[in-house]
Design a protein with these regions (language model features):
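N-terminal Rossmann-like dinucleotide-binding module
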Residues: 1-57
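C-terminal helix-rich "cap/oligomerization" subdomain common to oxidoreductases
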Residues: 1-9, 76-78, 281-305, 310-325, ...
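Beta-loop-alpha module in the N-terminal Rossmann-like domain of NAD(P)-dependent dehydrogenases
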Residues: 27, 59-119
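Short, Asp-centered acidic motifs that coordinate Mg2+ and/or phosphate
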Residues: 41, 76, 156
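Aromatic/hydrophobic pocket-lining residues that form π-stacking "cages" and hydrophobic walls in ligand
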Residues: 50, 89, 116, 142, ...
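Hydrophobic residues in well-ordered beta-strands that form the structural core
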Residues: 63, 102, 127-129, 158
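Predominantly a Rossmann-like dinucleotide-binding segment in NAD(P)-dependent oxidoreductases
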Residues: 126, 133-218, 222-237, 241-259, ...
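Contiguous C-terminal substrate-recognition/catalytic subdomains in enzyme active sites
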Residues: 241-315
Length: 406
């Protein structure tokens, strides 16, 4: 697959947003900066969010997903609601004849994923699952280097990241394993997407361990997994979200969102949480920092590097490749060189590239519904493996095509 650069188009795609929470807040700088899309409609139960949305974007506001999907100003529905609602909202969008961009995890069960894929197929619309960090330009560039054949085939992939994920502000559902809480479903999707893309083959099985060692956050906060692929490639995945060591140190002190890391913020998530008296205060504090809240956080920056998801190393037959926020390090037989990338003009622009290429040019998206379902299958298998202490075979996998540059 050649990386897509959509044809110019005279009219921006109208994006209807379901869920004006944190995921939307993170995507907002992209929607604002990219002229190929415009925010045309929104749906959220919080009055303060919809009021600001209407005022800021002169957009329509709806009270149901079905009404938003019927809005003629909407071409694409961005499903950024909590994961337990993804299937219902994506299906409503497809039935309304709208293309779907849905946040990860795609859903909470494979049956839900299949129903989303079926609805999109029946309606003749595209489903794209993202943003995930497999969209990041350094990851895609690494895929291009692999596809060139210069460094031989990939044989082993290592991915690891240490964050404060578990101690960021959370809703009660996010701390309930029965409702999909924990890092495996919510952060594992990033790493699984990345290693599947880099391996370029179908995953066949997974073995995982999960860590849960803080009673105040009673969900999995860490994991280690080994994923096997057809052709003998294997990948190790490690993630820890307890807010001590910061994995951004291994990425040039650039944060996950591509911003310069402020070392004074070490431990900030734990300090903020410790200042709150109970779960109700935590929910209120989270809402205040989301779109429309009194303390809304801006993620826009004029000094951006590429986004990342921690340390990733691909061991090929003749070199190790390491994607970084400013390019890809190539550790070859006789020298180490940087394959540089220019800084991004727009954060997460690759998501809009893929979306516009699908809608305008009919190019099959890389991160389609079947891709998202395969990633969820691996994540669910990681949970099963950790619980049952055994390898779990995978049955719904799809392989990524080789990604080449022009």
């Amino acid at each position: 697959m050649t990386l897509v650069h959509p044809s110019p188009h005279p009219r921006a795609l109208g994006v209807g947003v379901i869920g004006l929470g944190r995921a939307f807040t993170l995507m907002l700088p992209t929607f604002i900066a990219d002229p190929r899309v415009r925010l045309s409609a929104g749906f959220d139960p919080r009055d303060e969010a919809t009021a600001r949305f209407t005022a800021e974007f002169k957009a329509n506001v709806h009270t149901t997903a079905e009404a938003l999907a019927a809005d003629p100003a909407v071409d694409v529905v961005y499903v950024a609601s909590p994961a337990e609602h993804h299937a219902a909202h994506a299906i409503a969008a497809a039935k309304g004849g709208k293309h779907v961009l849905v946040e990860k995890p795609m859903a909470q069960s494979l049956a839900e994923c299949q129903s989303m894929v079926d609805a999109a197929d029946q309606a003749g619309v595209h489903v794209i699952v993202g943003h995930s960090h497999s969209f990041d330009r350094p990851i895609l560039r690494t895929c291009e280097l692999i596809a060139s054949g210069v460094y031989g085939a990939p044989k082993m992939i290592a991915a690891q990241y240490y964050t404060d994920f578990l101690f960021r502000l959370r809703r009660p559902a996010e701390l309930d394993p029965a409702q999909g809480g924990g890092v495996i479903l919510n952060q594992g999707a990033h790493q699984v997407d990345i290693v599947r893309l880099l391996a370029g083959a179908k995953a066949t099985s997974v073995r995982a361990l999960a860590g849960r060692w803080d009673a105040t956050r009673p969900v999995d906060g860490a994991y280690a997994a080994l994923v096997n692929f057809e052709g003998g490639v294997f990948a190790s995945l490690l993630y820890q979200g307890y807010g001590h060591f910061d994995g951004d140190e291994l990425c040039g002190d650039v944060t996950e969102l591509g911003q310069r890391r402020d070392r004074r913020q070490q431990g900030a998530a734990r300090r903020r949480l410790a200042s709150l008296a109970n779960a109700s205060e935590e929910v209120a504090a989270k809402a205040a920092r989301n779109y429309g809240g009194a303390e809304q956080v801006s993620y826009a920056s004029d000094d951006l590097a590429h986004q990342h998801f921690g340390l990733v190393v691909v061991s090929c037959e003749r070199a190790d490749l390491r994607p970084l926020p400013n390019g890809v390090m190539v550790y070859a037989d006789s020298e180490a060189t940087l394959d540089p990338l220019p800084p991004p003009r727009i954060p997460r622009v690759e998501v809009i590239d893929e979306l516009c290429a699908a809608v305008w040019d009919g190019k099959p998206p890389l991160h389609d519904g079947r891709w998202g379902m395969a990633t969820l299958e691996v994540c669910l298998a990681m949970l099963d493996s950790a619980r049952e202490n055994r390898d779990i075979a995978l049955h719904r996998q799809v392989a990524a095509p080789a990604i080449t540059s022009h």
